[in-house]
Each structure stands twice: as structure tokens, then as C-alpha cells.
């Protein structure tokens, strides 16, 4: 029997075919840490080169700036299903077995003690035990070993390490990503997934783990090739879950995972899009398309600049004033097609399609001005959640998706350091930093959200570099005065596998935000900067509305992959789902 071995680190999404005598490659993942220097404040004047209207300038820019258009990409759908069969009976391209370190235990005769591995190894004539020993495969997270088995029902059998225990959503999502990587490497069209320790799982745990694996598989297959001249289409068509149960409950869990995953992909595509393609108008168009797609439950209201002026959104419009691309205020409303509405929620996202910093321009490589398309990340998460919710259609809950979309640019019409602006709730703000613009747009967005009569608001934004200093790149900061709302959102984040850490709302820090000429300044300095930013936002939320702020600046981008993460969608959708009846 000819057998070829493949080894990899799951997080790298790369598989290497090797002979038995080779050693597995050691590929480790790393996090990129942003080092934030003190802000350089540079102010200068720019003489306008033309006197035409912003609308005309927008048309010219959109027609000539790079002549770039995204390639049309259809995301292939994967068929997910469950079966209760013997693992040795399945026929297809890859049988992927998730194993913990405990599952890899062997007896005195070097045979597996785990029942599933023992049966599978006997079916393969002892090859599984031999290969795992030779390759020092122990079930550690990131380890993967794949055997080619021509002539048998499964063309390949893979062992994928889950670590000491498999109990977290992120562990099962990583398993799904490893399945996707193996499928891409071998051009497999059919995969079956089994957990070696599934017999110890409760029925609910089996359903949840299947959902997480499905999510990881969909996202692991995704590659954003819209701006590349060549791309490859994934070959994977079907994934069968063996030993996870069958019937409507499993089907519903798998469908939920699919809907959320495609919402995450939509978010990734928005954040990945360059600013010369994704303008505020295009972002608004994408939102309107969602309303059209889910017209039985969703409507769109896009406010233009004049309408925002009528609503006295001076804070938001001050940020937008310098750009040739006019602002577009996005408001999507989800209402169930039937039944009473018991709860009204709002999801508010920061929507800067590009942030130059304004007159306090971003200078130096540490401030990554070339990457400032990522400032659309909060709004992208909100719209990704809208897409998923349009598919899932949770009952009994009304959801408002709100984005104040604009660019923060530099021109003779732009806001200047020292300007005093007035938000739509009448609060005045001294602009002591034009690069602290996100909170200015969110201020009017939060006032608008409260005016919709909602019970709870969650806003999400790439708001401060200081949160990266505080928490690093693996989690987002969360701020709220409501313990109950904090519990709700933390529970949603834990179920989704997205890490949040509750930060203090230290009111004494408000002293840093006081102005001599206005009600407040918009930047209180770097010390406690993420906290003071949250305290600023709090001033624009009605006292009768529960509110929570997520600062996701460190989680929006994966520098190693040079791509957006899609962070926030899963947590927001889970939170909405938990508030439905």
C-alpha cells in the first residue's frame, strides 16, 4: 500500500507532503504588535486646486483614481450534513479526525486506547499508530498529519491536533481551518470530520462544536482575490459530520454557522477594499443592497449631507468637511416579518472609509497611514452582522444598524485644530486633535440611535491606538456602565470565540477632557486614552438607554496574513440572537 504523509501547522494553512522519514515542519504563528509613538501634530494649509462642487470632484475621482474595480467573485457554498455511521465506512477524499493529547495515549503494545482511533488504526493495518509515533504527532494544537491511502474508502486520513482538551469555540474553529487547509492542499471535494473524543460530549456540545468547525471551514477556505489578476476557486463541495448527531437541530446549527461566516466574509471584503474603491457612497450602496436582498425584513434609509445638516449633525459633518467624497449616513432597520417586537437594539459602527488624520496628519510608519482603510472596520462588522441577521431572521427583536460614513481628509474646507463644533444633542466640542475623528462621527450616530427609541446600543469601532497598548492584538476592549449588558455581550463573545476584556469607566479621567472654550475636547492625551474616548462617547447616549462600546483597533487586521479579520460580526449576531424571543 502506497502511503504519503503530509504535515503542517494548521494556523499556517499550508500543508507539506513528506515521506515517512521526514520530520514535520515547525511553523509558528506570531502576533504583530503595534508600537505607537507620541502623536506628531503637523498643521499646514492647502490651497484648493479647483472650485467645483464636491459631487463633481467625487465623480472625477471615482472615474480616474487607479481605474480599479473589484473582480466579481462568487463564494462557493459548501454542503454541510451529519451522519451516524462507522468511521471506516465513509468514502470520500479526506477523513479528518480531531484529536486531543489525551486521545493519543497508547498501551504497552503501542496501540491506541481511544476507541475511534483504535478502530481506525485496525482498519489501516496499524499505519496510523506507526506514523503518529514516527512523526512525533501528539495532538498538540497546530499539528496535522495526513496519510494518503489509495484504494481505500477514504483517500486520505488526517489527524488534527486540538491540544490538551477540546472545549472552546476557538479550538474547533481552528480544526475547521485545518480541514480547509488540507482540502485546499489536496484539491479535495469531499471531507468528513470526526472527533476522537466525541463519545464524552453532551448532545449540545456536539452541536456547538459542529457549528464552530463549520465556521472555521468556511472562513479557512476564503481568500480575497478580488484585486488580483488570477485566483483559484476552492474545490471543497461537501463536509459530513460523523458522530455529531443528525436531524433539524444539527441542520439549524450548521445553517447558523454558515450565515454568520458569510457575514464575516462580507466584513472582510469591506475592510480589505482600498479607499479608491470603497468610498462612503459605495459603502452606503452596499448597505442598500442588503436591504434589497432581505426586503421582507429590512429597509434602508440613507441620509445625504443636507439631511444630516437638518438634523444638526455638526460633529459628524466636521469630520467629513475636507473630503471630495461626500458623507453618507447609513440606517438599516431589521424588523421580523411577523410577531410582536419585544426588544429594540442598535448596532453602531465607526465608518471612516479612509483616515488621513486630518491636519494632525498621521506621520511615520508606526501610524500606518497606508493601512487606514481599516478604519471602516466597525461599520463593516455592523453591516456583516446585518447580512447574517437578514438570513437568520431572529424573531421578537428589532435591530437598527447605524453608520456615519465619511473620510477624514485634508483641504481648505476641513476642520482645523482648535475649531469648536456642535453635535446634534447640543454639546460643544473643541477639536484639539483632528486624528481623534472617529468619536466625533460616533457622537452624532449615538444621538441618532437613541432617537430611534432603542433599549440597548452596542457600538464598535477602531477607535484608539491606546487599546492596543493596553490589551495587545488578541482581544478588544469593552466599556459599559451596565453590568447586565456587559454579561450579555461577554457571553456572546465567549460563544463566538472572540475575546473581549472589560475596561474601567473611570469618571475621574474626565478631567482630561475638559475644555476652556467648549463643553469638552475630543482628545485627552495618550494616558488612559481608550478610557477617555469611551467617556467621551458616553456623553452622547441618553440615560435611559443601556450602552456598551467595543474598541477593536487591535483586532481589525491580521498583519501576518495582510488581511482583515472580520472581528465583531460573530459576537454582534450572537448578542442579537440571545435578545430575540
From Swiss-Prot:
Q: Name one GO molecular function term.
A: metalloaminopeptidase activity
**Which InterPro entries does UniProt cross-reference here?**
Leucine_aapep/pepB, Macro_dom-like, Peptidase_M17_C, Peptidase_M17_leu_NH2_pept, Peptidase_M17_N
Enzymatic class: hydrolase
Where is the transit peptide, renumbered to this chain?
1-50
The subcellular location is: Plastid, Chloroplast
Catalysed reaction equations from the record: Release of an N-terminal amino acid, Xaa-|-Yaa-, in which Xaa is preferably Leu, but may be other amino acids including Pro although not Arg or Lys, and Yaa may be Pro. Amino acid amides and methyl esters are also readily hydrolyzed, but rates on arylamides are exceedingly low; Release of N-terminal proline from a peptide
> Which residues are responsible for catalysis?
362, 439
Keywords (alphabetical) are: Aminopeptidase, Chloroplast, Hydrolase, Manganese, Metal-binding, Plastid, Protease, Transit peptide
Q: Name one Pfam family in it.
A: Peptidase_M17_N
CDD domains named in the record? Peptidase_M17 (cd00433)
Query: Single Gene Ontology BP term?
Result: proteolysis
GO CC terms of this entry: chloroplast; chloroplast stroma; plasma membrane
Primary localization: plastid
Q: Which family does it belong to?
A: Belongs to the peptidase M17 family.
Entry's HAMAP family? Answer: Cytosol_peptidase_M17 (MF_00181)
Q: How does it assemble?
A: Homohexamer (dimer of homotrimers).
Stated role: Presumably involved in the processing and regular turnover of intracellular proteins. Catalyzes the removal of unsubstituted N-terminal amino acids from various peptides. Possesses Cys-Gly dipeptidase activity.
Q: What is this protein called?
A: Leucine aminopeptidase 3, chloroplastic
From which source organism is this entry? Arabidopsis thaliana
Amino acid at each position: 500500500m502506497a502511503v504519503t504523509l503530509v504535515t503542517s501547522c494548521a494556523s499556517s494553512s499550508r500543508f507539506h507532503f513528506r515521506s515517512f522519514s521526514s520530520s514535520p515542519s515547525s511553523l509558528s504563528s506570531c502576533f504583530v504588535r503595534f508600537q505607537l509613538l507620541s502623536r506628531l501634530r503637523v498643521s499646514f494649509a492647502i490651497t484648493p486646486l479647483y472650485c467645483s462642487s464636491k459631487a463633481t470632484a467625487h465623480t472625477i475621482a471615482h472615474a480616474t483614481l487607479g481605474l480599479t474595480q473589484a473582480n466579481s467573485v462568487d463564494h462557493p457554498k459548501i454542503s454541510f450534513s451529519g451522519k451516524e455511521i462507522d468511521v471506516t465506512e465513509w468514502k470520500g477524499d479526506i477523513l479528518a479526525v480531531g484529536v486531543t493529547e489525551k486521545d493519543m495515549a497508547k498501551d504497552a503494545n503501542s496501540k491506541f486506547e481511544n476507541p475511534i482511533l483504535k478502530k481506525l488504526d485496525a482498519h489501516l493495518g496499524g499505519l496510523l499508530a506507526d506514523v503518529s509515533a514516527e512523526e512525533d504527532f501528539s495532538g498538540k494544537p497546530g499539528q496535522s498529519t495526513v496519510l494518503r491511502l489509495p484504494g481505500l474508502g477514504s483517500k486520505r486520513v488526517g489527524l488534527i491536533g486540538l491540544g490538551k482538551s477540546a472545549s472552546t469555540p476557538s479550538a474547533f474553529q481552528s480544526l475547521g481551518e485545518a480541514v480547509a487547509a488540507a482540502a485546499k492542499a489536496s484539491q479535495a471535494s469531499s471531507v468528513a470530520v470526526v472527533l476522537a473524543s466525541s463519545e464524552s460530549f453532551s448532545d449540545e456540545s456536539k452541536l456547538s462544536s459542529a457549528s464552530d468547525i463549520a465556521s472555521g471551514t468556511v472562513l479557512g477556505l476564503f481568500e480575497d482575490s478580488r484585486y488580483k489578476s488570477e485566483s483559484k476557486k476552492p474545490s471543497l463541495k461537501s463536509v459530513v459530520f460523523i458522530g455529531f448527531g443528525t436531524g433539524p437541530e444539527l441542520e439549524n446549527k450548521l445553517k447558523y454557522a454558515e450565515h454568520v461566516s458569510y457575514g464575516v466574509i462580507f466584513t472582510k471584503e469591506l475592510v480589505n477594499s482600498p479607499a479608491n474603491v470603497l468610498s462612503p457612497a459605495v459603502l452606503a450602496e452596499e448597505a442598500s443592497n442588503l436591504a434589497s436582498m432581505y426586503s421582507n425584513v429590512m429597509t434602508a434609509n440613507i441620509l445625504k449631507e443636507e439631511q444630516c445638516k437638518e438634523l444638526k449633525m455638526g460633529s459628524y459633518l466636521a469630520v467629513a468637511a475636507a473630503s471630495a467624497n461626500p458623507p453618507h449616513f447609513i440606517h438599516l432597520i431589521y424588523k421580523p416579518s411577523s410577531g410582536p417586537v419585544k426588544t429594540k437594539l442598535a448596532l453602531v459602527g465607526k465608518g471612516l472609509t479612509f483616515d488621513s488624520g486630518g491636519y494632525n496628519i498621521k506621520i511615520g510608519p508606526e501610524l500606518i497611514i497606508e493601512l487606514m482603510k481599516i478604519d471602516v472596520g466597525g461599520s463593516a462588522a455592523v453591516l456583516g452582522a446585518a447580512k447574517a441577521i437578514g438570513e437568520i431572521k431572529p424573531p421578537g427583536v428589532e435591530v437598527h444598524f447605524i453608520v456615519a460614513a465619511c473620510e477624514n481628509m485634508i483641504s481648505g474646507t476641513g476642520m482645523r485644530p482648535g475649531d469648536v463644533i456642535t453635535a446634534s444633542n447640543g454639546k460643544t466640542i473643541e477639536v484639539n486633535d483632528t486624528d481623534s475623528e472617529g468619536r466625533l462621527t460616533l457622537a452624532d450616530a449615538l444621538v441618532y440611535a437613541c432617537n430611534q427609541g432603542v433599549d440597548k446600543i452596542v457600538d464598535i469601532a477602531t477607535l484608539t491606538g491606546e487599546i492596543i497598548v493596553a490589551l495587545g492584538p488578541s482581544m478588544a476592549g469593552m466599556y459599559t456602565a451596565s453590568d447586565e449588558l456587559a454579561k450579555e455581550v461577554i457571553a456572546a463573545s465567549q460563544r463566538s470565540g472572540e475575546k473581549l476584556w472589560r475596561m474601567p469607566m473611570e469618571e475621574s479621567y474626565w478631567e482630561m477632557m475638559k475644555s476652556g472654550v467648549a463643553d469638552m475636547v475630543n482628545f485627552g492625551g495618550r494616558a488612559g486614552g481608550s478610557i477617555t474616548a469611551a467617556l467621551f462617547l458616553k456623553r452622547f447616549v441618553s440615560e435611559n438607554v443601556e450602552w456598551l462600546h467595543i474598541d477593536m483597533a487591535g483586532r481589525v487586521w491580521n498583519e501576518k496574513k495582510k488581511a482583515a479579520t472580520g472581528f465583531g460580526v460573530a459576537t454582534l449576531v450572537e448578542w442579537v440572537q440571545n435578545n430575540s424571543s
